[in-house]
Amino acid sequence: MAPPTRLQVPRPGTAVPYTVLLGWLLAQVARAADTTGRAYNLTWKSTNFKTILEWEPKSIDHVYTVQISTRLENWKSKCFLTAETECDLTDEVVKDVGQTYMARVLSYPARNGNTTGFPEEPPFRNSPEFTPYLDTNLGQPTIQSFEQVGTKLNVTVQDARTLVRRNGTFLSLRAVFGKDLNYTLYYWRASSTGKKTATTNTNEFLIDVDKGENYCFSVQAVIPSRKRKQRSPESLTECTSREQGRAREMFFIIGAVVVVALLIIVLSVTVYKCRKARAGPSGKESSPLNIA
């Protein structure tokens, strides 16, 4: 009599782990298929309200459409079916720089120019929220002019233009931020490295310096009320020059001498003509008569 056949029971750690591993692999494949070409790493790049949304990846088999909205508005589509990985949203965010904006990037498989057959609900990725007034970076300021006269140094910062409009006119950075915008001046003797600072909520500085010393300086835009992105990069460094100051003084001295000389000449000619005009009639009356 043959012995009964024993039932083969899977050993722990063999068939079950294989099943789990297979399920995990299928899940990873499904995830990869779902995310291939889908936009990610959405980033706002904004300076002085010039605002661009960037994302990844640079795909050859997907195109993208960007949508933007505020918290109370419907989505508005921009940059339709673009193969690029950036979209300029400046014209939308400058409408109200105090609003908070949200954007999302929809991903579509490329169709060689054929826009039919796209899914009604394509995969998309949301951006972080963006409030232009709080989140745009301050651009590098420019020193418009400077002059050192004696113990006074006057520095004027150029009022940068933005793409924010009011009544059809582009506003300056000062017009947008008002007194929230400060400038810090860093200045030092050209012969030393010890820096001093001055701050103003206008675009001009007038500071006391040592007479006869050259000074170097730079400026930086600051919004103290912000929690982040408070400061701009520093401007290019400018320096005064005693030679320039002396040349300016000589120019004014020479100009004054020329003006005085011209006045003397004009007065002399005028006096001469007046005397000649007076002497003419009297000379005729006193001349003897010619008797034939």
From Swiss-Prot:
Q: Which cysteines are joined by disulfide bonds?
A: C79-C87, C216-C239
Record InterPro entries: FN3_dom (IPR003961), FN3_sf (IPR036116), Ig-like_fold (IPR013783), Interferon/interleukin_rcp_dom (IPR015373), Tissue_factor (IPR001187), Tissue_Factor_CS (IPR030472), Type-II_Cytokine-TF_Rcpt (IPR050650)
Q: Membrane side Extracellular: which residues?
A: 33-250
Q: Name one Pfam family in it.
A: Tissue_fac
Signal peptide from the UniProt entry = 1-32
Q: Which SUPFAM superfamilies match?
A: Fibronectin type III (SSF49265)
Please indicate which superkingdom the organism of origin belongs to: Eukaryota
Q: Where is the lipid attached (S-palmitoyl cysteine)?
A: C274
Keywords for the protein's UniProt record, in alphabetical order:
Blood coagulation, Disulfide bond, Glycoprotein, Hemostasis, Lipoprotein, Membrane, Palmitate, Repeat, Signal, Transmembrane, Transmembrane helix
Q: Which residues lie toward the Cytoplasmic compartment?
A: 272-292
A Gene Ontology term for the protein's cellular component? plasma membrane
Taking every annotated instance into account, which residue ranges of this chain make up the domain Fibronectin type-III?
Answer: 35-126, 148-240
Where does the record place it? Membrane
Gene Ontology biological process terms in this record: activation of plasma proteins involved in acute inflammatory response; blood coagulation; positive regulation of angiogenesis; positive regulation of endothelial cell apoptotic process; positive regulation of endothelial cell proliferation; positive regulation of platelet-derived growth factor receptor signaling pathway; positive regulation of TOR signaling
So which tissues is this one expressed in? Brain, heart.
Which parts of the sequence form the motif WKS motif? 44-46, 75-77
Task: Write out the transmembrane intervals.
Answer: 251-271
- Glycosylation positions in this chain: N41, N114, N154, N167, N182
Q: What is its main location?
A: membrane
GO MF term list = cytokine receptor activity; phospholipid binding
Give the family from UniProt.
Belongs to the tissue factor family.
What does the record note on quaternary structure? Interacts with HSPE; the interaction, inhibited by heparin, promotes the generation of activated factor X and activates coagulation in the presence of activated factor VII.
The identity of this protein, by name, is Tissue factor
Q: Can you name the source organism?
A: Oryctolagus cuniculus (Rabbit)
